């Protein structure tokens, strides 16, 4: 019964409300209006007109008083469940008790049309609208949506099969109202076709990421989101057919008061004070009404009249700014709309590239893709890594040139193809070691290692000496030719000089004779002629030229290898315990001066009888440059928003005192957008123009309300690192029998792990004076993030965490208010954004980036510096203090015997030498092999064990006796073999980078052999006498060889002459 009466009232409203400002049907009809299609999932609601859907008056605090007055004697008890104390409608009694949603939702929509005074009294002939709606001229409306999931608690207990709550259910606090908004309607002219096209294009540009609003397409999208409710401001414009609605997150509105219409005055009957809310004047007032000063200035007023009219403080006529133009809309307001946004086409979860492959041969590394082109590839081998962004290529080849990875080296390649497929490939670069690593002819590696070709070295030596002899002879011949040319040119040169001198003397004599004749003519005296003897010239001596030739064979510096440190029994103190387990300690400080990334150092103590403790393993994960970070914060691509409204004096929130009396809540009321307060925002009020020229009744300055706020433009988040001082640091993993921990040590820092102290010292001036701008990396869940330098540190937001940056939180983000500058004009405000584009800087200096001799990149979410070229070897050391550590050693009688099967590797290089041993042990335990410069810790099992032992030697030709020791035995082993000098991988590509490494210059001089000394040892042995004789023989050998050749030629020529002489004599006598 109630529903049918409400429906009748609603239908009457649609045709009889001529002065109702909420009726959009004065300008448009429901089939042409945009963005207001029904969002209620009820079939009955779809037949409602636009006015019936949106015209629920914005009463707020008035509802309770109106209903209480109406309940006394007007039969309103049945409407009590619809009572609402605020705009946040919590639902009705029907929602909580009934299994039907239809009636209460429609009641909520039609609530604004119920005329309480005329309830039941000829409703079809009276306007079913409350006077408060006419007084405010601002209508609020709701968009209902229901049912919403379930309204029952406790895992849906008390719900029927349709999902509705029954009487047994514990009621939820249902909230069926999705959106609440306000709107203002006014007289407006139609916009022409050109203006409509301009507004339509501006709507697309201001909402680039919105696909549709309430089902109306805004932009074409390949993939749209499921949708969400979003508060938008809108302005509706009249077209010749239908309407056009402009929407944006905010609107700049300018209100003016021109030609005050009668509807801007609220007239009531003053005779009956009890019914002021229900008895407005039946018709618009004329001269027979009384009113306020403004009303009487427009109309003639009577002092005694039952009707009194007052100015209701109307906003006036609204103009909205679209682009750089101002338009007068028919309706302006704000509402939550159901918006579907564009979803960027994300790459599908990376699939493995099944057509990608990698090979590692003697020539180099080749990475290829059969199906798609390579997008980016990172290749690492022997600690060197190179990155390449491919340009339309399916193959990337890296040549080794005159180098080859050592035995067991594995090349690793990671990257993606243009189709988004990822690959992670490995390839073993052969089992070559020692002399097999040399893959060039007449190169430095070959010349430095004569031990690798025992027979060819003599031939090579002869070629070298012969080449030197030829060079000397060639230089001597050139000098002879030069001197011969000088001797040929000497004669003509002397002749020319003599002729010039002769001519000079002749000229001088002639001049003297002329002078003498002149004097004789004057003095009549004749004197005898004087003849001078010529001056003889000496011959110039020819210069002597002395030639000095120096031969030097150089090899490059190399790194050390993995090593074991054994603390001898004399430095260890042990106390016996049960089961032959001794508790031992040492005061000795172990210093390791040769360090590299990937190196493992084993430290063991020798107990009674030579028994070894379980080693303390120190794994060097990296040695890179790190920085103390001044600041770490999150930022985003900020979008500057500026929203302004101009209000004439005495209208709305612009009171008598103008901007001085404006409060915080006034901005929200005037600008109509509370969601912007969730973002960093600033509120300002400026004095604007007043008077008739600006469309205002009062000449006092108007109020221009302005809100500036910053939002995240694209939901992307970036993390910013601001480095200060840089220093070398190492990350190590320490493993003992009972503990394992990783720690980062920076230069000069000491830390304790499981009672073992580690002190790291390096060259602190390596990065002195280095200045690096802030580093930015994009926070991404999938895919490769952008990393780059923040060169232009202009205005940008700074947030505490990722979520605050993604939502542009006002509480956790700091933004300088100068990021949005405001320029106040006569009746509006123009804004300019000073925000910098964070993502736009990614193309200027992307990481990795070369900085001097170093390469900076992000590694494990922190900026690090890597070495390039020859900058990677620096001095440094790691000190290990075991004085506070008790180490257990089990003493047993393990007996082991062994033989050396093979010795391969290099000397003075990163990986060092490897001795392959075959050890037979009587029981499981530990064994050690100790040589003159290094030692090796090994774990053995009962029986035969094939183990590899890492050692260091000082010579390429090794012939040394080492000691193989177990807890119950010691044995001498002879190690012989040829190693190569160097053998380290120099560089993968020109732009490759690697971790830093440390080496000791003193130790380097001990175990690094120059190529010349290696040649002497190889050719003539290690004794001094052998080297002296060998050097002398090498110097004299060319001359001796030439003498022998000459002697051979003479013998051959002599024999040929002897053979020819008998034939000549026989021919003579015949």
Swiss-Prot record:
Residues 480-522 are annotated as: Golgi retention signal. Residues 550-560 form a propeptide. Disulfide bonds join 22-55, 152-165, 211-221, 267-309, 296-301, 353-356, 360-429, 380-385, 561-602, 574-584, 642-831, 648-696, 654-703, 659-685, 689-694, 799-813, 896-966, 906-909. Residues 648-654, 690-701 are annotated as: Fusion loop. Residues 18-457, 550-1023 are lumenal. The record marks 560-561 as: Cleavage. Residues 1-17 form the signal peptide. The chain crosses the membrane at residues 458-478, 1024-1044. The keyword Lipoprotein applies. Pfam families: Phlebo_G2_C, Phlebovirus_G1, Phlebovirus_G2. The keyword Signal applies. Residues 479-536, 1045-1070 are cytoplasmic. Glycans are attached at residue 269. Residues 541-560 are annotated as: Internal signal sequence for glycoprotein C. One of its GO terms (biological process) is fusion of virus membrane with host endosome membrane. GO terms for cellular component: host cell endoplasmic reticulum membrane; host cell Golgi membrane; membrane; virion membrane. Keywords: Disulfide bond, Fusion of virus membrane with host endosomal membrane, Fusion of virus membrane with host membrane, Glycoprotein, Host endoplasmic reticulum, Host Golgi apparatus, Host membrane, Host-virus interaction, Lipoprotein, Membrane, Palmitate, Signal, Transmembrane, Transmembrane helix, Viral attachment to host cell, Viral attachment to host entry receptor, Viral penetration into host cytoplasm, Virion, Virus entry into host cell. The record marks 1068 as: Important for glycoprotein C and glycoprotein N subcellular location. Belongs to the phlebovirus envelope glycoprotein family. The sequence shown is that of isolate Human/United States/1/2009. This is Envelopment polyprotein. It comes from Bhanja virus (BHAV). The gene is GP.
